[in-house]
A protein has these predicted regions:
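Broad hydrophobic/π-residue packing in well-ordered secondary structure
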Residues: 38, 42-44, 95, 129
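Conserved N-proximal alpha/beta basic substrate-recognition cap immediately N-terminal to
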Residues: 1-41, 54
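ATP-dependent carboxylate/phosphate-activation module, predominantly the ATP-grasp catalytic core
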Residues: 65-170
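Residues at the C-termini of beta-strands that transition into short coil/loop
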Residues: 26-29, 63, 142
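ATP-grasp fold ATP-binding core
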Residues: 11-17, 39-63, 73-75, 103-121
Length: 170
């Protein structure tokens, strides 16, 4: 089960098969040109993620304006001395020459490309939920909050209580 959870394509397939909503996936790009083409039709942007793993390792939140050829990418990846590292810090990139090798490295993992769905807000921060369950029982829920679009807690983001959400009832 753990291996299935770390395989993003397989996890999405299982969740969908059990009538749970998942972030819409786009066709997987295999080159930087295909990525730019896919992003041209995605006004909110997309997340390019390695197929396997967790903890924001290797993800890229990407926005692209094709008319201006303008890129904005948020990622934990950084290329240092021709080696790509997961820095556990979010970097903002705008130069195609910096973005291209990172995106190609992620695509070589059998990446997935997801539509960027805006997150709800709680007290001025974006949030999402990390839900852990076994069988049909929810074990716990963590509300993950961030000023940006990437909410993973190991990136110095904030955890909040479920009871702080305006939609929850005691």
């Amino acid at each position: 089960a753990l291996l299935q959870a770390l395989d993003k394509k397989e996890a999405k397939r299982i969740l969908s098969a059990n009538d749970l909503n998942v972030t819409p996936m786009l066709d997987t790009p295999h080159s930087f040109d295909e990525l730019a083409q896919a992003l041209s039709g995605c006004s909110r942007g997309c997340f390019l993620k390695p197929r396997y793993g967790s903890g924001a390792g290797g993800i890229m939140a990407i926005r692209y304006q094709p008319r201006q050829k303008k890129w904005v990418v948020y990622t934990t990846l950084q290329k240092v001395d021709r080696v790509i590292h997961n820095t556990k810090r979010i970097h903002r990139l705008t130069k195609e020459q910096d973005i291209l090798p990172l995106a190609e490295a992620v695509m070589h993992t059998g990446a997935i490309l997801e539509e960027w769905i805006p997150k709800e807000q709680l007290q001025g921060e974006n949030y999402d939920l990390r839900v852990v369950s076994g069988e049909e029982e929810i074990d716990y829920v963590v509300v993950r909050c961030s000023k940006g679009g990437i909410t993973n807690l190991h990136l110095n983001n904030n955890a909040r209580l479920w009871s702080e959400l305006p939609c929850t009832r005691p």
